[in-house]
Amino acid sequence: MFAKATKNFVRETDSGGDLIPVSHLNASDKVQLLGLVTKKKKFWCWQKPKYHFLTVTLSDVLTEDKPIKPVIVESDFAKYMGKFEDFVQGSIETSFGKISLGAGGKGYMENRTSFGNLRKQEIDLQQLMKDIKDRTINLNSRLLQQVIERKHEVLCILREKIITTQKCTITEHVQTEEKISGVMGCSKKIIKVSVSENASMMKDASVILEIPPATAIAYGVIELFIKHSGQFEFCLLDEQQGGFEKESIEGSADPHSGLFRDAAFRYPPDAVDNEMYSGAKNLIPSDASLSVLKQDLSWLKTQFQPFVKLPEDKQRALYKTLCELLLHEEMVTALEDVLDDICTGDKPDLKELNLTQQQDLVDFLELLGCSLQSEFTELEKYQPQDEALLSAAHLLVSAISELSDTLVLLRACCDLQVVPALCCLPNIASADGTVTLSSPLVAALTDRGRFDVVRRLFASSNINLEMTESSLKAVTMKEPRFFPLVLYVALYGFYALGGNVQ
């Protein structure tokens, strides 16, 4: 709940900016100005960097024993009140519920969010740069040696944070449609954040989380570039990249494990995160037919072959488990983090999860043949019996995680058995994106209810889908970035696992 609320806040107030949402309430106390933060480089081109708070500050790793006392500048940030409305019409039934879409009947959903008056605390950079002049970092410290050895992390300092000034509550409501034609209702979680005026609570709330004053909900960092000598500099410009000088001397060693050496969508180890330089903005052209994805999708077929080769019972188990995960966004994120760690040689950490979530995650890893040899929260050893299978699962879960805002629609497409038809579109679409409805490959999409679900899913991934009496037309929207590709990674993954499994 907390992660969803902070993510929405950053998206609404600083989209494309430098703010990073705090993902866990218990991590808020770790958001300390001048504290050290590690940034794990991206694995796939669509992933966002992962950040981890260390227990030390910049002062603690400098060679001299003279502590830095940063000048903190505090100011009003905003009074944040967000209102999200979603008008939906009509309905279509799936195996897990009725989804309101299309024509005939109306629905309305409103989500109000308020963190109240927010304050911004930031370090006076000019003064800080004077304070650290001619000072060096102790590269022999045990902590920094661990960061250097991992090779895929960048050291940062925390330069700013956004904090609440009054108590707030986050309330998770579950809206359920009535049973229709014997089909169970479809639940959708709605996250609401509001400032507490008194002790009263909503009666229909299923989960309530209280946020105390002075809670950090977002923060910003500055990457450090650290030289052999221990001298360091702040990376203040977009084109500057943090890291350790040692990396470049070692020949730009690939930070990723051998599992993924041939992965076409891997993020270049020396690329920076700003989309102007990563090429994400121009990855897929605007107003283009889905046929532009054909080359990448041919590689996907190879990458997902381990799914195809699985015995039918194991295929079905993986497919059903992943379909269930689509209704639990937090578990998708946790699973992606663990697979990232395994595939980069790090030790997974499940301490943020409750025991049930830990068990579910371990059960999923065992489906992949990843045998764990210790307690859930201390996964010291893992023995992947099939590295190619682990690679395929990592690719699919990473794509699903990026589609977090539309996971219910993706689940609906799985249940409506339209995934095979969607996977055919790039291969049979003409140069202008047209596909004739007479093709048996797209017969499942001729139903108006199914089409409306697919249209909304495609729109969320920057694909415009239209249907006439005789044809479908699917083209990318303006500056689609990597989103059409990510959607098709997810679709191909489910298709390879048996898109029609019941």
Residue positions per predicted region:
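Residues on the lipid-exposed face of transmembrane beta-strands in outer-membrane beta-barrel proteins
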Residues: 90-94, 182-186
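Membrane pore-forming effector domains from diverse proteins
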Residues: 2-83, 102-179, 194-299
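Long, helix-rich, hydrophobic modules that act as membrane-proximal anchors or helical bundle/coiled-coil regulators
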Residues: 215, 222, 228, 236, ...
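Outer-envelope beta-barrel architecture signal
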Residues: 97-99, 189-191
